[in-house]
């Protein structure tokens, strides 16, 4: 949603999306394309370019919160850290949250806890 051309594609204000939260994501599909999983996924270069958030960062983007767990697989941590770094490199507002003691599957539970650092960042993003 954050990379959609809302004005060009839908006639809406370019800033219709005011912020975004991404948790424990894969932001570049090239490692999957290069892995044995691609034998059944059939991800080609066009799909990598089209479906990788890291490769779709627009010039204008809403503030983002990128969260990941301390105990996640290294690849998920790397994806999150590199995506957050690339957003900042392009001068986009980005809050990076490394959640102590959590794994990939526990990250979704953080959205149900108003006191979690991830939800606190969400609240700050929307101004409450």
Question: What is each model feature region?
Answer:
Residues 67, 77-84, 88-128:
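C-terminal catalytic histidine-bearing segment of alpha/beta-hydrolase fold enzymes
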Residues 29, 71-75:
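Acidic catalytic loop of the alpha/beta-hydrolase fold
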Residues 42-55:
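Alpha-helical scaffolding within the catalytic cores
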Residues 52-61, 78-79, 110:
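Conserved serine/cysteine hydrolase catalytic core
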Residues 1-38, 48-49:
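Primarily recognizes the serine-hydrolase "nucleophile elbow" in alpha/beta-hydrolase
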Residues 16-18, 62-63, 92:
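Loop/turn elements at helix/coil->beta-strand transitions in domains of secreted/extracellular proteins
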Residues 11, 55-56, 88:
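A general structural signal for stabilizing positions within well-ordered secondary structure
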Residues 60-61, 65-69:
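Short beta-strand/loop motif that positions the catalytic acidic residue
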């Amino acid at each position: 949603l954050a990379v959609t051309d809302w004005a060009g594609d839908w006639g809406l204000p370019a800033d219709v999306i005011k912020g975004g939260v991404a948790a424990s994501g894969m932001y570049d599909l090239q490692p999957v394309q290069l892995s044995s999983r691609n034998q059944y996924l059939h991800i080609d270069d066009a799909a990598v370019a089209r479906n990788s958030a890291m490769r779709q960062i627009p010039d204008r983007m809403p503030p983002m919160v990128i969260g990941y767990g301390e105990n996640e697989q290294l690849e998920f941590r790397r994806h999150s850290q590199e995506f957050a770094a690339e957003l900042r490199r392009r001068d986009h507002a980005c809050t990076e949250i490394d959640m102590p003691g959590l794994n990939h599957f526990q990250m979704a539970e953080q959205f149900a806890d108003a006191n979690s650092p991830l939800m606190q960042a969400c609240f700050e993003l929307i101004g409450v």
